[in-house]
Amino acid sequence: MAGNFSEIESQGNISLKFGFLGLGMGGCAIAAECANKETQIKNNKYPYRAILVNTNSQDFNKIEIKNAGNVRKIQLEGYEQGAARNPQVGEEAFVKHETKIFETVKQEFEDRDFIWITCGLGGGTGTGALLKAIEMLYEHDYNFGLLLTLPRDAEALKVLENATSRIRSIAMNQEAFGSIVLIDNAKLYRKFEEENPSALANEYTSYSNKYIADALHEINLVTSSFTPFSDTHFDASEFAQVINTPGVLSLAKLELKSNQLDTENPLGYLTQLGNALEKGVLYDTEREELESAKKSALSIVTSPLRASRLYNFSFLNQMENFLKDRTPYVDERPIAPYVNKHTAKKEEDIVKFYSVVAGLPLPKRVSDIIDEITRIKEEREQANSKKSNAVLNKLFAFDDSVQEEKPKKKKLNFGAEPEAEVADDSQPTKKKLSF
């Protein structure tokens, strides 16, 4: 989704007013990037608000903020050096300043339709504060969901363990709040590497934050910016119902040229659409997971020229059957064909598909992280045991007993004129120690 906006699309209307509560370094960076999203809507250039909560004072200096009026920073005083990847410290810091944080939430998010708690799982501040932030919003009846990044396998063992520990706690209580959007850092990192092979390593963070912000912003535009072609559409109120659905939320997007959409031979483009649905924008979803979804929707956007030719009964029927096949047990699954009357000339031939699927189980990626933790621990134990045994074997083989040396026998001297013995009253030389 990132990088696919046209200037005209940025003039569209947003469906829902989002607030972002950023926790820790990663969460604050994502929240700030979401608040940086611009539109050309009159009196609403920056439609989103963010509150950034962190311990380490230096982290705030790394965050670019385009409109200070839409972003509030809360420094957790007394913890300026950070939480050192210790979630207990992050939780303690949040609890100590919870009153101040909640007062800011009331002030900044009073008119928000939905709040996203953003957090990079695995660290200290964000991971530690996450459960307390959930409790705070839940107890005060806010509509909210979670926007969480999953660590890559290359992260340290402690990071992986911190992340899985929090996911387990969240899973036990996920029916109490709205959707969970998971961002697989491993997936985004591979995408960045493929698209930017010569880029510097430190450019990835900026790329991923913008990618996440664009994905959420674009789907929020689609549901409110274009002209419905038929009586069936997916509006802002339905989008609100979807993101308020407990469980994991998957976003997907596919762009095809109109000549790739042969309604008489639909297998080709339906296969591509199915792959896009499973791959997702932010994390991969398996087909079996999609089948357990609670809600789904598919929006289609194209130019007026293509809409008049494409949106026939046969095509829309194929779309309905496709979504029914992929998400058979959902409560609702609207198919919404839209017309973008402001399509740029170069995009007149493009057809864009957007899907949202809610109420999903935790993805296989979480299981993969647990497997990675198990592998690291087993290999570490084997390595330590092997090294320890090698040292012990040497120690046990080492003979540290000292045998008493016999005095050397005096050489005989039968010379013609033997020298007279001279008494030596000096003390014997002390033997040096050798360890």
From Swiss-Prot:
Sorted alphabetically, which keywords does the UniProt record give? Cytoplasm, DNA-binding, GTP-binding, Hydrolase, Nucleotide-binding, Plasmid, Plasmid partition
- Which residues take part in binding GTP? 25-26, 124-126, 185, 209
Q: Which GO terms describe its biological process?
A: cell division; plasmid partitioning
Q: What is its main location?
A: cytoplasm
Question: Which Pfam family, any one of them, does this sequence belong to?
Answer: TubZ_C
Q: What is its EC number?
A: 3.6.5.-
Region entry Disordered, spans: 403-435
**Phenotype reported upon loss of the gene:** Loss of plasmid replication.
Class of this enzyme: hydrolase
User: Where does this protein reside within or beyond the cell?
Assistant: Cytoplasm
Give the superkingdom in one word. Bacteria
Q: Which GO terms describe its molecular function?
A: DNA binding; GTP binding; GTPase activity
Tell me what reaction this enzyme catalyses.
GTP + H2O = GDP + phosphate + H(+)
Q: Which InterPro entries match?
A: FtsZ/CetZ, Tubulin/FtsZ_GTPase_sf, Tubulin_FtsZ_GTPase, TubZ_C
Activity regulation comment: GTPase inhibited by GTP-gamma-S, which also stabilizes filaments.
What GO terms fall under cellular component here? cell division site; cytoplasm
List the Gene3D superfamilies hit by this protein, alphabetically.
Tubulin/FtsZ, GTPase domain
* Record family assignment: Belongs to the FtsZ family. TubZ subfamily.
What's the domain remark here? Consists of two domains: a nucleotide-binding N-terminus that hydrolyzes GTP and a C-terminus domain necessary for polymerization. The domains are bridged by a long, central helix. Interactions between the C-terminus and the following monomer drive polymerization.
Q: How does it assemble?
A: Polymerizes to form two-stranded filaments and bundles at higher concentration in the presence of GTP. Binds to the TubR-tubC protein DNA complex.
Q: What does this protein do?
A: A tubulin-like, filament forming GTPase; the motor component of the type III plasmid partition system which ensures correct segregation of the pXO1 plasmid. Essential for plasmid replication. The filaments seed from a DNA centromere-like site (tubC)-TubR complex which extends to surround the TubZ filaments. Highly dynamic filaments grow at the plus end and depolymerize at the minus end, a process called treadmilling. TubR-tubC complexes track the depolymerizing minus end of the filament, probably pulling plasmid within the cell.
| Protein name, UniProt field | Tubulin-like protein TubZ
Q: Which organism is it from?
A: Bacillus anthracis
Q: Which taxonomic lineage is given here?
A: Bacteria, Bacillati, Bacillota, Bacilli, Bacillales
